[in-house]
Each structure stands twice: as structure tokens, then as C-alpha cells.
Amino acid sequence: MSLFVTFEGPEGSGKSTQARLLYESLHARRFPVILTREPGGTRIGDLIRRIVLDLQHTEMAPTAEMLLFSAARAQLVSEVIRPYLEQGGIVLCDRYADSTFAYQGYGLGRDLAELRVITAAATGGLRPDITFYLDISAAEGLERKRRKGARSTGQRGANNDEWNRLDARELEYHQRVEAGYRELIAADPERWRVLDARQSIEALAEQIGAIVEPYLASITRLETVL
């Protein structure tokens, strides 16, 4: 058996932190686990990430954006996610296909039926077992990310994930993304686990761990190497 867990949420929701904490917890318990992200996680995906998130690429067409994200996902599924799941491991992914529906579908107004066809091709129909949604309003999440970016060093741009081209869009765009997530959750409630992102990091990590725990009984732990 294997387990595929994804983390979704608006900008500044803390999903990346929670994905990392769950990875560290499972790794410490000797479970076969990897942590990856979208876009990225592969050499090709990381190159695409630089292109789609670069603040200077304001001329990018919505269709190009949608296809680039999907291309990065296709490479990640083929190179990393599917092979590890086939070995019986646990894959934790910071964003997955739901992000494309929320950001490019609802956010940019792309046709959802078209997105379903493209996503099916990119993923081969691979769906997460659990998707955590860290719930915070678009306005509050963006303010969190602005504060975090202000504390970071270095120039904001292609090499800095603290503030990117999608973050820089108007608040109304991010509110459409937030509303889109709620539509996705309502359409598939058994897969989604909605958590209040305004809680402490520790409280969220404890809740996520408790939700994942029942799924671990079927996962074979790694042997201790002496």
C-alpha cells in the first residue's frame, strides 16, 4: 500500500510549513516518505517554476500559464510521484492539480472542462488520498506573505519564492481563487480535510498528524540500518 497526501491553500496559509513538519515526523518514524512541490520537484519542473513565477513575466498568456503548470505536473508525476507510490511509499506534495483548477480555472476564468482534460493527461488520473486545505481569507493570507517577504533578504524575483508573479495579482483574483477552492471542496468532501490556518503551527501539525495516522497501518516502515 502507498499514500498520496497533498497540501492546498491560499498564499500565506502555511501549507508549506505543515507539509515539511509532517515529512519530518514521518521520516523520524522511519516511514518511506518524500516531500515534493508544484511547480518543481524535478530539474525540468524547477526550470518551469522559475519561468511561471518570475515577476518580470507579466506578458505571459493565461493559456501558456495553464499549460506550463500542467507540464511541470506531468514531469513530476512521471519522474517522482508515481514511481515512489508504486514502491509503497508516502508522497507529500505541496500543491497539486487542485491548484490549477483554483488559480488558472477559477482565478483566470479558464474553462474547467478543458482543464479536466489537460489535468487527466498530465496526471494519468492519479488522485491524492487526502488533501489538506489550510483555510484563511485571501486578504489575510496575502498580508502574512507580505510580512514574511519583508523579513526575507535578497531581491524579490525568479529566485525568491517569498513574493512571485501570482502573488502580485489584484486581491479580487485571489478572492476568486479562494472561492474556487470552496467549490472544489464541496464537490469532493471525502478527500478534503479543511483546517483553520489561523491556529498555531503546533496545533495544526497535531491535527494533521492525527488525520494521517490511521492510514499508516498499511505502510511498511524502513529497516533500521546499523
From Swiss-Prot:
Gene3D superfamilies linked: P-loop containing nucleotide triphosphate hydrolases
Coiled coil: none
Pfam families for this protein: Thymidylate_kin
Catalytic activity annotation: dTMP + ATP = dTDP + ADP
Similarity-based family: Belongs to the thymidylate kinase family.
Role of this protein: Phosphorylation of dTMP to form dTDP in both de novo and salvage pathways of dTTP synthesis.
HAMAP family: Thymidylate_kinase
This protein's name: Thymidylate kinase
Organism: Roseiflexus sp. (strain RS-1)
Lineage: Bacteria, Bacillati, Chloroflexota, Chloroflexia, Chloroflexales
This protein's encoding gene: tmk
